[in-house]
Swiss-Prot record:
Family classification: Belongs to the NqrDE/RnfAE family.
Organism (species): Vibrio vulnificus (strain CMCP6)
Subunit organization: Composed of six subunits; NqrA, NqrB, NqrC, NqrD, NqrE and NqrF.
Function per UniProt: NQR complex catalyzes the reduction of ubiquinone-1 to ubiquinol by two successive reactions, coupled with the transport of Na(+) ions from the cytoplasm to the periplasm. NqrA to NqrE are probably involved in the second step, the conversion of ubisemiquinone to ubiquinol.
HAMAP family listed in its UniProt record: NqrD
BP GO annotations: sodium ion transport
PANTHER family found in the cross-reference section: ELECTRON TRANSPORT COMPLEX PROTEIN RNFE (PTHR30586), NA(+)-TRANSLOCATING NADH-QUINONE REDUCTASE SUBUNIT D (PTHR30586:SF1)
Membrane topology category: Multi-pass membrane protein
Protein name: Na(+)-translocating NADH-quinone reductase subunit D
Transmembrane intervals: 42-62, 72-92, 103-123, 131-151, 178-198
Protein's gene: nqrD
Cellular component, GO annotation: plasma membrane
GO MF, one example: oxidoreductase activity, acting on NAD(P)H, quinone or similar compound as acceptor
């Protein structure tokens, strides 16, 4: 398999074939919390992709010099440093969105997707493939976030990226916003529906009966 095909597979596989949320059921908590608006879902996607990609890269770069007994601590130190950079950038340039994301930017440090890829892939692979793997898993995470955020904001407030898409009753239109879509349980059900849809079209992802 060529290098280009390997890169394509590493980036696209986590989106549907091995999605970190839909298949591995990781990172669900933040997916419930930051998807009330498409813009927060999009920014969170960029943040997690940035942290996952670079943490993978740096962990892989020094993997042969990390004592096995402290590898988790080293990984968390690298991830935490990158999260602090992301948090400071958001506060400097996207302060309103930073306030909306609240503690969930800081909680990227404990995100199972980020920690999982650093431990399972970056510790055993070269830096560039690890970087690409991080990008792919960040995009897989973002695919679910953006899809859920799209439906929650559209049907919850009739808007996308804060701009009115469905004419609201309050403004003389026909659409009555569904407040239920702005509550966390709606995200839970939407993610469940996505998992069902993906496994319907990809039955090989269904767990075998014991």
């Amino acid at each position: 398999m060529s290098s280009a095909q390997n890169i394509k597979k590493s980036i696209l596989a986590p989106v549907l074939d091995n999605n970190p949320i839909a298949l591995q059921v990781l990172g669900v908590c933040s997916a419930l919390a930051v998807t009330t608006k498409l813009e927060t879902a999009f920014v969170m996607t960029l943040a997690v992709t940035f942290v996952t990609a670079l943490s993978n890269f740096f962990v892989s770069l020094i993997r042969n010099h990390i004592p096995n007994s402290v590898r988790i601590i080293v990984q968390m130190a690298i991830i935490a440093s990158l999260v602090i950079v992301v948090d400071q950038i958001l506060k400097a340039y996207l302060y309103d969105i930073s306030k909306q994301l609240s503690v969930f930017v800081g909680l990227i440090i404990t995100n199972c997707i980020v920690m999982g890829r650093a431990e399972a892939f970056a510790m055993k692979s070269a830096p560039v493939p690890s970087l690409i793997d991080g990008i792919g898993n960040g995009l897989g995470y973002g695919f679910v976030l953006i899809t859920v955020g799209f439906f929650r904001e559209l049907f919850g407030s009739g808007k996308l990226f804060g701009m009115e898409v469905l004419p609201l009753v309050n403004n003389g239109g026909w659409y009555q916003p569904n407040g239920l879509m702005l509550l966390a349980p709606s995200a839970f059900f939407l993610i469940g529906f996505m998992i069902w849809a993906i496994r319907t079209f990809k039955p090989e992802q269904v767990e075998a009966k014991e």
